[in-house]
Amino acid sequence: MTEFTTLLQQGSAWFFIPSAILLGALHGLEPGHSKTMMAAFIIAIKGTIKQAVMLGLAATISHTAVVWLIAFGGMVISKRFTAQSAEPWLQLISAVIIISTAFWMFWRTWRGERNWLENMHEHEHDHEHHHHDHEHHQDHDHDHDHEHHHHHEHGDNEEYQDAHARAHANDIKRHFDGREVTNWQILLFGLTGGLIPCPAAITVLLICIQLKALTLGATLVVSFSIGLALTLVTVGVGAAISVQQVAKRWSGFNTLAKRAPYFSSLLIGLVGVYMGVHGFMGIMR
């Protein structure tokens, strides 16, 4: 095979590199690249564009690293070692991590709602106790005290409703603006989503290695990964922008967003189960 430097001089590399980027982008549109999980994750945490980019890049980095590890590992371990033989094991590992992530998302949302309800219950109890003490120390006549009590109760009820609404809105904002999800958790989820190898990229790299054209193979794999990153980042950013726009234009979005993490965690869990079953069946063959 022609050396990469020669291809550069001939101008052929400028055809290979864009082609590899385009193939990577198209490859990212194929099923099985965690696009559904990434979109569900971004929607669940109401992630920002920065977090969406981070998620897509993390998935691409792990995807590229797996290609290199399998290619070189396969050459060291056995000539019969292929991407097809390693894929079921990686699917099984990814399934375990993905299901764990789905469970964590579900538990985090459920715990947050319980804590909020308990805090509101304690606030209501303390408010009623304070109201009782206020009545006890009144020095007015009975009729006036009764009227004052009625008016005060009505005002407190309105104040409580306003406080309840504000607390609920702040809780939704706190839970779904991404602040509770650390960058490390986003990176971990992205790295997990990119563990499934691409047999085509591994095959190209192996051919280039065997033909002693490592630089060319590395360049093609990196270009392929750039195209894949463009697709995954676009999916994540699209989900993030959609959430932000819907939240601005639809007042009822917060009500829906309160339940979104449950649906997202369920969807992610189902994808993880599917990957686990598929990987297990591949191992048993």
Curated annotation (Swiss-Prot):
Protein name: Nickel/cobalt efflux system RcnA
GO BP annotations, alphabetical order: cobalt ion transport; response to cobalt ion; response to nickel cation
Transmembrane region(s): 11-31, 57-77, 87-107, 186-206, 221-241, 263-283
A GO MF label: nickel cation transmembrane transporter activity
Highest taxon listed in the record's lineage: Bacteria
Induction trigger: By nickel and cobalt. Transcriptionally repressed by RcnR.
Localization annotation: Cell inner membrane
Gene that encodes it: rcnA
Pfam families: NicO
InterPro entries reported for this sequence: Ni/Co_transpt_high_affinity, NiCoT_RcnA
Membrane topology (Periplasmic): 1-10, 78-86, 207-220, 284-285
Intervals, Cytoplasmic compartment: 32-56, 108-185, 242-262
The organism of origin for this protein: Shigella dysenteriae serotype 1 (strain Sd197)
S-S pairs: none
Bias kind Basic and acidic residues: ranges: 135-146, 153-164
